[in-house]
Design a protein with these regions (language model features):
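Class I S-adenosyl-L-methionine
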Residues: 34-104
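Mixed-charge interfacial surface used for oligomerization/domain docking
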Residues: 2-3, 11-29, 33-34, 87-90, ...
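Ligand-binding "clamshell"
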Residues: 105-111
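A glycine-rich beta-strand to alpha-helix segment
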Residues: 82, 111-112
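Generic enzyme active-site microenvironment
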Residues: 7
């Protein structure tokens, strides 16, 4: 297996990767009075509760150059992944760290991917990179494979609450309040430009699953891998897994709790799903 390090900011929801040299670089969620570092020590449920009670501004902060340089280490090749540059400065900072590391050691090769996404879609990209490296694929070919593969993956999400999005100015507070009062779930996707794109609104778990399935079909899903991350909503995530497996019995589908950064955006009850088209 090629000895290439994989690194990603914590929007990937992974802390370790079995059998691989993998480093997670924490983002931070901040309010006017508290700070939550998205690392292994974070109490995600506690953070979600605290943010629900926050009426002031909240926002996410990306890793700094030193954080990324530490993740890249002092030698060797690295493939790194960041949350979409449409939501965070993590990609730009990682690129600055790459340039600094390569200036110190011109023999190094560091490839940074702007995922144009978050969470489960990044997990798919990392899994693909790991599979290629385990198979002995060389560095340049792995990077080319990932560039092609990225065009075949997508991210959808369904949100029960938009409180945090309103608190950091990404949606209007009126829209967030109305959706909450009416019990409306918002379904959306990561656009081709890496921004949040709303696709529709629905009420109830059944309608939410139907809306997500229709969106997957429109984007070309035919039974490929699916990764479902949830924020305190294991029931909906498992129901969606069951629905997909009923339609596509051979599909590779996994669900798991989101970590800090993605829980900040998905909020309580929200789910995010990455899939192959």
């Amino acid at each position: 297996m090629n000895q290439v390090r994989l690194a990603a900011d914590s929007s990937c929801d992974l802390l370790t990767l079995s059998g691989m040299d993998f480093v997670s670089v924490p983002l931070t969620i901040r309010t006017e009075t508290e700070e939550f570092r998205d690392d292994a020590a974070l109490d995600v449920d506690g953070m979600v509760r605290a943010l629900r009670d926050t009426n002031g501004r909240s926002y996410s902060a990306c890793p700094n150059v030193a954080d990324w340089e530490g993740a890249f280490g002092g030698c060797g090749d690295v493939i790194a992944f960041t949350i979409t540059s449409g939501l965070s400065g993590s990609y730009g900072v990682a690129c600055a760290a790459k340039e600094s590391c390569e200036e110190r050691d011109p023999s190094r090769r560091i490839q940074v991917f702007d995922s144009l996404s978050a969470g489960p879609e990044i997990a798919l990209l990392i899994e693909k990179a790991a599979a290629e490296l385990r198979a002995g694929t060389n560095f340049d070919t792995v990077c080319n494979v990932l560039k092609s593969y990225q065009s075949q993956t997508h991210l959808l999400f369904a949100l029960e609450s938009m409180h945090n999005l309103a608190q950091n100015g990404r949606v209007s507070k009126l829209a967030a309040t109305v959706a909450g009062v009416l019990g409306i779930r918002v379904v959306g996707q990561a656009s081709a430009e890496g921004t949040l794109e709303m696709l529709g609104k629905c009420r109830g778990a059944r309608r939410t699953l139907e809306c997500l399935l229709r969106a997957m079909e429109r984007l070309g899903y035919r039974g490929g891998r699916v990764r479902i991350g949830h924020c305190q909503n294991e029931v909906l995530a498992q129901d969606f897994c069951s629905e997909l497996l009923h339609l596509f019995p051979q599909a590779d589908i996994k669900s798991y709790p989101l970590r800090g950064l993605c829980s900040y955006y998905a909020e309580r009850g929200g789910i995010m799903l990455g899939f192959e088209a």
